[in-house]
Amino acid sequence: MANVTGYTKAGVDKLVAPLFSSISPFTVGGHYYSPVTYFWPDFYNEGQAGKVSKWAKTLAYGNALGYVIMNRSTGDWSAKDNDFLTQAQRAAAAGAKRILWYIPTRYGVASLAKDDAARNGVPDPDKFTREYIMQLCANLRSQYDGLFQGVFLDEVINGWGAQAGRVGWYGDLIGEIRRTYGKNFTIAINPGSNITEAVCALDFDVCMSFENTAAKYLTDDPNSPIANDVMRALPSTKWWHVIHGVTRENFRQVIDRAASFGVSHLYVTDGELVEGEGGQWVPEKNPYQNPPSDWIMERVLAWNGGYLGLAERVAALEAKAAPSPQPGA
């Protein structure tokens, strides 16, 4: 058939593609399962007898997935790794809405004087300069091209106390990333706690503003609220809560608590953190070493789909209708 409109398909695609790429996959008020996927690519274990693929178990969440994180040796992006390329491709195909790539920032201590107390105990305090972080971003774009959809900046300041002096350094870093990669590139930050108004004003897309235990999540602390008034005024898609040490008994309380904060991105796991002598840098038990137990998946999918209450009622009815065990059975 002749082209009567004067437009070719290639021409239309070129015009329309930028419009679709600028549409966020996240809806304010929506629920997204955004796991902390620090484990190594293991797609080659999928379907192998006697082997388990942690990534396959994670990607089984399908369209419920929000963000996933690629983390090679705590941010070593000096060379292309085809295992990470393949795993990122599989994550995108499974339904992950954005692929983030891990880069630590060491709380910006590289910007401080050599004798500043904030540098004490921080590994490689001089390494993660703004220039070095930008070079890692450039490496990632060169190595993984369109799969480099965003960056997960770990070990970010919350802006309180003496950290206030480093907000400008983060503003410069985030601003340079934004100018280089554009408005559709995702910038995630992880202070792991509530943040000041000055940090809220930075040009990030999502902030992991809670990363701690279920016990702490379910406790009100007026001296350290999980979300302050400035944070609560921002869209739900800005916030990502990670809760470990979750149990069958407190799962629903955790979910209800997240709803009270207006959080779109959630990761709950029954994995536990035990810092031990290694502290936060080398913990004895890491809650992200493995995906959550299977019982969490069914509940998370119900939460994501908006039918958690119904699923719980059905489960309660099934339990009530189940025959009681007979003596001697």
List each model region and its residues.
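Amphipathic alpha-helical oligomerization/assembly segments
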Residues: 6, 11, 15-22, 307-325
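Glycan-processing catalytic domains of CAZymes
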Residues: 17-310
